Amino acid sequence: MLRGKRVAVTGHTSGIGKEIYEYCQFNGAEVRGYSRRSGFDMKDRNGDHIINDILRLDAEIVFNHAWYPRVQNKILKILHTQWKEKEKVIINTGSATCYYSIGASIYESDKAELRDYCIAKATDYPYKDKCRLHNVSMGWTNSAVLEGVEEGDYFIDPYEAALVLINLVMPQNYVMTEIVCNAKFKPMKNMVQLRDKATANVIRDMQLEVKQPWEE
């Protein structure tokens, strides 16, 4: 499934992205990771350097995992447009927050746009568009967004979350365009800390040091 394939993973140094990257490496893929540590900060150049490098790599499989305001959607849309005539796969890490709001509007609207784009383009595959798209709206995962929250059985393990995404690589006689992968829920009174801390972490990560073009 992965051996010998050219694979790109954004956000490959922690959480789900790290698990995807290591799984692909172990299974013989030619995998390239994109993160600040590898010189590909999503804040830089609105993600253009990442997109250009993935195009130069001519990746066959892209795990569009990392999020930054507007950039994750930009990566999806440009790669998809460029690859309409090629048998590629783009697997996006969305968020269940586009179904169950936590109050982080930019994050949630970005993730909803990611989902909606994949669903809208699904009717073109494969007769008009050979590039296959998937989106997984992922629930609470033990990752950076929950930093500071005590671990509990309501988290999805990052390795298990990675497998949900990786299993979409193999072509089937059907296409699972959108998947909602929920963690286990508890009564809302027990989820308040989780929700509030996640919201604070997302908002913190959205506080940009430099004003970006989409804010003007």
Regions found by a protein language model. Give the residues of each.
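Catalytic loop of short-chain dehydrogenase/reductase
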Residues: 84-128, 139-143, 150
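Adenosine-cofactor binding site in Rossmann-like domains, unifying the SAM/SAH pocket
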Residues: 31-53, 67-70, 74
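N-terminal Rossmann NAD(P)H-binding glycine-rich loop of SDR-like oxidoreductase domains
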Residues: 7-26
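C-terminal helical subdomain
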Residues: 135, 150-216
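Conserved catalytic-site loops of classical short-chain dehydrogenases/reductases
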Residues: 60-63, 78-82, 86-94, 131-134
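Conserved Rossmann-fold SDR core element
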Residues: 125-141, 173-178
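Conserved NAD(P)H cofactor-binding loop of Rossmann-fold oxidoreductase domains
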Residues: 63-71, 94-97
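Short-chain dehydrogenase/reductase
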Residues: 76-80, 117-122, 162-165
